[in-house]
């Protein structure tokens, strides 16, 4: 085996291991939350840095798919956020990954971070076809997948985890 081929095999294995680890994390979070056993360990976190770390992982995992993720901090200052780093990192990763994964062509994803009087508001959007209204509530149910997306990899647990983690932080 040539060195370049060996390195590609190692890189591919590392990506697959990280993907499996993320899937296991999501399953554990969702399982604990559905049994009301989810423990929140809040600390001060830099939400921009956390979002950039999730973006870097997505950039690696989706290197062969054209995409761009823009992270926009609209707060007056880069204030720290009091949240569970582990949960919020998984939320950000899942939302951005879904935006890239389910875009048919080039995925242009926008992450906007704003601050109101009491909360940090995070929105993740893309310019894809959107989600049909009849599925918009169902997609947050554990193991639910929109029928037209079954050709993509996934288990229907990511958005359930997002819902549980966001609710645990007092969000919607």
Task: Name these PLM-found stretches.
Residues 12-20:
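Short alpha-helical segment of the dimerization/phosphotransfer core of two-component systems
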Residues 99-100:
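Short helix-loop "hinge" at the ATP-lid/N-box region of the Bergerat-fold HATPase_c
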Residues 41-56:
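A conserved beta-strand-to-alpha-helix junction within the catalytic ATP-binding
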Residues 61-72:
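Short conserved segments within the C-terminal catalytic ATPase subdomain
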Residues 170-172:
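Conserved glycine-rich
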Residues 35-40, 78-83:
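Conserved micro-motifs of the catalytic ATP-binding
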Residues 166-167:
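Detector for a conserved hydrophobic position within an alpha-helical segment of the HATPase_c
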Residues 131-143:
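Short conserved segment of the HATPase_c
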